[in-house]
Each structure stands twice: as structure tokens, then as C-alpha cells.
Amino acid sequence: MKFGVLVSATVLAARLAHAVPTSIADAIMSRASRDGIDLSVLDTMPDILAAITDTYNERGVQYPQDDRKKAARVGSRGVGNIFDIHAHAEPDWYRKVAPFTGGNADRNDGGGTPSPAWNVSSHLDFMQTIGISHSILGFTSPSANAFLGDKERTVALARLINEQLAAYARTYPDSFNFFAAMPLPYTDEAITELKYAVQELGAVGVALMSNHEGHYLGYDSFTPFWQAMDGLGGRQVVYVHPTTPWLNVNETWIPANPYSDIDESRMEFYMETARTFIDLTLTQTIHNFTNTHFVLPHIGGAFPTMIDRVLKTVHTELYESSLEIYRTRFWWDSASPTYFHQINGLLAYDIPKANLLYGTDYPFISAAVTAADFDSIMAYPGLSDEEKEDLLSNNYKTLFGDKLHFQ
Ligand SMILES: *[C@@H]1O[C@H](CO)[C@@H](O)[C@H](O)[C@H]1NC(C)=O
Ligand SMILES: *[C@@H]1O[C@H](CO)[C@@H](O)[C@H](O)[C@H]1NC(C)=O
Ligand SMILES: *[C@@H]1O[C@H](CO)[C@@H](O)[C@H](O)[C@H]1NC(C)=O
């Protein structure tokens, strides 16, 4: 009898597993077509929809009907209370689209770092090792910009990335939230995706690349996007991730990196962070959209080094107002080895310690290196024990406010 119950439960589960995929895929496709997006331009669409469906089915979670205004739930899974704001999802289907980080689908020349294998269970294991209870997932470079110059595929890829991220966040609500990918430089489509990701899928912010098809974030055509975001109501969080410095020369995309001896993520990503935040400053994008807060990767990369250089020589009129913004609406993640020495350069600008956040860059930085980085934070003499605890487990609460509901 017991055996019989077990069999019928298994059969039922199999039937459900068979029935549910179609409906999730249908729902995703019908919302995409409602928003003018043709997902079928990606020839891997069926695999991607199957992967997203599998994510929901792992724990029998429903596809979101409407997440509007629902604050995401954040728990502490009892493994420490550390919050990771710089963490990447890298599902197998995405590694097929973009095998190299910083490269793109048509560029298998090894110019980027080969994207590491990743899955939810290895990510959860990693979190357990470090004592991280919650991670905000985003896709790393090239994110939705894997098909340079191809609007339809960029827009479709952004949508599917966001559906996949929402599936992780829905399925593991105590462990994950997400930053949505945006199909810039296509501003109108990015505004549509922004509203969908934030209002319907429940993204806690957006992840922008340092440049989108060679355009830095202060680019004129992006202003309506900043306007739309700032006008969504309440605080908006923009996480910026460095990417390859793309130049379009004579209709050909080339990475503007004359130094090819090490991969672009090592040095160019720091330069990229500097370029785009200088651009956001000089165009006064950061001045004009006052609801918008920025998370800077790697405690700003090479950006802090450039501040005096640029704003004490040219555009001196922006110096004080910019520093004021860097000290209030800018937040600085610790990802990769930043607390051995680099942190001193940032803090020299009187950046409040309450704006320091913890980030890992997993899976691009291994658990062993992350542990060493963690130790360097703990050994850093410039922060008190309380300030270190806040960096790891509290400052993000001030950043996200009512976007996250703390258990
Ligand atoms: C997840 O990734 C880890 C590390 O790459 C691997 O050992 C493991 O087999 C993977 N698990 C699944 C379910 O794919
Ligand atoms: C651009 O392409 C045209 C036509 O192929 C060629 O004549 C020209 O030299 C190219 N310019 C550069 C800068 O490569
Ligand atoms: C911000 O406002 C200033 C005027 O105060 C204007 O000159 C500048 O172009 C604006 N920049 C953006 C990106 O809106």
C-alpha cells in the first residue's frame, strides 16, 4: 500500500514535470511578445526555456504571476550573515552563448577569460564555505551584449537572462536576489525591460556594463533610460560591471586593449570602471538623477585614482558636488583582492565606511582566493571590528531599504 502511494506520487510528479514546462515556456514567450520581443531570434531559445523551466521545477515553484511592489524576502540560512553583492550566475546555456568573459559569441580567440562552470548547488556550497547567507546574482560581461550590433538578439538575450535570474530568485528566495540585465544601447527596449524586470520579475536593481557597444554610461542617447529609472519611484540601485572596451572601427568591433599578455578582466576592467564613472560624472548623469544609487565593483577599480586627476584639472566646477555624490549615493563592493592595499586610496577621499559592501565575484574568483580576500578584510587596520561587521552584514540594508524584507 505504502509502495503504491509512492508510485502514484512519482507518476504524478512526472506528469506535472511534463505539464509545467510548456506552461512556463508559454508564459515567458507570451510576455515577451506582449513587449515586442521575438525570443526565437536566438537559435538556442528552446534550451534556454527548458533550463529556466528546470530551475522552477527543482522545488516546484510557480512562475511569478505578478511580483509588483513585493519586497524580496531575505533570510539568514544559519550559515553566517554575510551578504554578497557581487556574485554571478553562469548557467551552462549562457556559457554556450558567451564562452569567454569579456569576449562575445563571434570571438572565440581566447581574448577573455574562459567562463567557469557554475550551477546553483556549487554556488550554495561556496556561500556556505565563506558564511554568506545571501547573494545578489547578476550576469557578468558581456551580459546581454553577446551579439554586438544585433538589436533583436540583444533584446531577446536580456529578456531570457532576466527570466533565468528571476527563476533562481523565486526558487531560492532565502539565498538569491538579482540585478537585471539591460539591452542597452537600445534605449527604448531597455526602458521596457527595466519596467518588466523591476515591476513584474522583482529585480532589486539593474546591472549595467561599463560600456554598451562602445558607449559609456553617460552617452546622450541613454538619458531617457536614466530618466525612466529615476522616475520609477523610490530608490533605484544600479550595479555597474566592467566589460571589454569595445571600439567600432570601420564596421568592425575591436577590443581597445593594446596589452594582450593577460586577460582583459585583469587590468582593462579597472580602466573601464574609471572610464564609465568619469563619463557619468562629466555628463552630470549622477547629479541629475538623484534617486539613483550606484554600486561600484572592486571598490571602484581605477576610478578613485582618477578623481583628482580629472576634477582638479578640468571640470573643477564639478569637484565638490561630485565628491558629495561619491560619499552618499555611491557604494563600493570589495570583490577581488581589494583590501590588501587598494582600499586606502578609496578611503583617502573620505568615503564613509558605511558605504562599503562585501562582494566576491564568484565563480570568477575561486573559494580559496575569496577566503584569502576575506582574511585581508578582517586584517585591515583601517576598520574597527564593528565597521567590518557592518561591511559584511549590515551596510547593504541601508542601501536596499524597503526593497528587501529582512526576516
Ligand atoms: C555543479 O558544479 C560542480 C562544480 O563544477 C560540479 O562538481 C557538480 O557536478 C555540478 N552539479 C550539477 C548538479 O550539475
Ligand atoms: C575602412 O574600409 C574601407 C573600405 O573597405 C577602406 O578603404 C579603408 O581604408 C578602411 N579604413 C580603415 C581605417 O581601416
Ligand atoms: C544634467 O543637468 C545639467 C544642467 O544642470 C545639464 O547641463 C546636463 O546636460 C544634464 N545631464 C544629463 C545627463 O541629463
Model-assigned labels for residue ranges:
Residues 20-81, 92-134, 163-170, 192-196, ...:
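Mid-to-C-terminal alpha-helical segments outside catalytic/metal-binding sites
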Residues 83-87, 135-137, 177-180, 206-208, ...:
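Hydrophobic faces of well-ordered beta-strands that scaffold small-molecule active sites
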Residues 33, 55, 79, 91-117, ...:
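Active-site gating loops and adjacent loop-to-helix segments of metal-dependent hydrolytic enzymes
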Residues 241-242, 247-249, 294-302, 335, ...:
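Short acidic/histidine-rich active-site segments
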Residues 1-22:
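Fungal secretory targeting signals
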